């Protein structure tokens, strides 16, 4: 018997082919094009130029610490670019981070020894650090050799020459004119000229230069501090306080605007306000013996003698506060402000009848700073008060 052959199932074969074709498409084409939900989505990398633009905008707004962070991000994106280290160091000088500025300027020089501005900013940063004026002079000369027509470098040289003493003043005068002639549209050339005029007691002209610098960038606290100091010398106290207050608003972490406001209020006899700002300055930088000394003086002016003794003791002898802050004392040298801490301390001791130590302070003042009239008067007052105390005990 012959079997009948079954016809092929064309529909089933077609369906199977379609299934196989779909499976191939799904595995080989569709799936590879889809994002893996278990793999992090890649983040677009920012260019160093975008960080630089951000940093420049922040600097123009006076936001120095955020500007510093933006420049650091630019360096992380392009660590071989020496100009980024220079830009960072420049902002760090304005922010008072002198050691960090020195480090970054040196990093720039390592990357490019012929970067003139790197040598200039290095000199500028060194100039603010005690005992480094000779290094600053060497660095600024190298900067001038590499680029003798750079206005910023000439401006930095003005500041270094001022710190070099009287012999550098005439050269500083010439340099300030060169800097302004090369570029009158940057802050540093006007700032350098203002510092020179201040150093030569031309305070009204110095004020004009600070104001010119502020016109270029109205958001740098340092400029308002300089402006206020010159107003204070001229006894224009309301303008001085206004300038210091603006500096404080721009950089509230800086204790010096508070310090200068404190001293300005003291100069016009408003001792309660002077004490308030002296306390704020110490809160900003509790390990600074100068700020402790000023606070002690203001306590004394307000007749808080025990508190004055405590704070002036920290300024003179150093020590550790109740909060665990370590302070290094200031030795008595020929400086009117340091002498003020010592004779005010002696007076507070005398007024609380602690004459054993008070008389030692008076003798120290008479020996160490004989030409300081205020210190000598203070020593005489200490002796007088202690003599009266002794008579009262008889």
Could you say what each language-model-derived stretch is?
Residues 1-46, 138-141, 145-156, 184:
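Long, contiguous interaction/recruitment modules in multidomain scaffold/adaptor proteins
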Residues 87, 121, 156-157, 192, ...:
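Canonical tetratricopeptide repeat
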């Amino acid at each position: 018997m012959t079997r009948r052959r079954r016809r092929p199932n064309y529909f089933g074969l077609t369906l199977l082919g379609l299934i196989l074709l779909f499976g191939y498409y799904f595995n080989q084409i569709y799936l590879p094009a889809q994002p893996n939900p278990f793999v992090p989505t890649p983040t677009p990398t920012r260019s160093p130029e975008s960080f630089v633009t951000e940093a420049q905008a922040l600097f123009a707004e006076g936001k120095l610490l955020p500007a510093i962070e933006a420049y650091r991000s630019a360096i992380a994106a392009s660590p071989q670019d020496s100009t980024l280290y220079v830009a960072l160091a420049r902002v760090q000088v304005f922010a008072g981070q002198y050691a960090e500025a020195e480090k970054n300027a040196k990093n720039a020089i390592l990357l490019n020894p012929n970067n003139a501005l790197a040598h200039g900013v290095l000199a500028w940063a060194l100039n603010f650090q005690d005992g480094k004026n000779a290094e600053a002079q060497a660095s600024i000369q190298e900067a001038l050799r590499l680029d003798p027509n750079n206005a910023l470098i000439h401006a930095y040289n003005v500041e270094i020459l001022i710190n070099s003493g009287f012999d550098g003043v005439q050269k500083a005068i010439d340099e300030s004119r060169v800097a302004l002639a090369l570029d009158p549209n940057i802050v540093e050339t006007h700032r350098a000229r203002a510092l020179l005029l201040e150093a030569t007691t031309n305070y009204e002209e110095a004020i004009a230069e600070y104001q010119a610098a502020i016109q270029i960038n109205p958001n740098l606290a340092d400029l308002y501090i300089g402006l206020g100091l010159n107003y204070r010398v001229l006894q224009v106290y309301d303008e001085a306080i206004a300038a210091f207050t603006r500096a404080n608003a721009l950089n509230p972490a800086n204790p010096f605007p508070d310090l200068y406001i404190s001293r300005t209020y003291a100069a016009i006899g408003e001792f309660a306000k002077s004490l308030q700002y002296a306390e704020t300055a110490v809160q900003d930088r509790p390990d600074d013996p100068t700020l402790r000394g000023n606070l002690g003086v203001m306590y004394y002016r307000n007749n808080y003698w025990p508190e004055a003794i405590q704070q002036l003791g920290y300024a003179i002898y150093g020590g550790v506060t109740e909060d665990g802050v370590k302070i290094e004392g200031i030795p008595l040298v020929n400086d009117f402000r340091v002498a003020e801490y010592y004779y005010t301390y002696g007076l507070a001791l005398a007024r609380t009848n602690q004459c054993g130590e008070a008389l030692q302070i008076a003798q120290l003042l008479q020996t160490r700073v004989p030409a300081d009239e205020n210190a000598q008067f203070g020593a005489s007052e200490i002796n007088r008060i202690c003599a009266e105390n002794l008579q009262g005990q008889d």
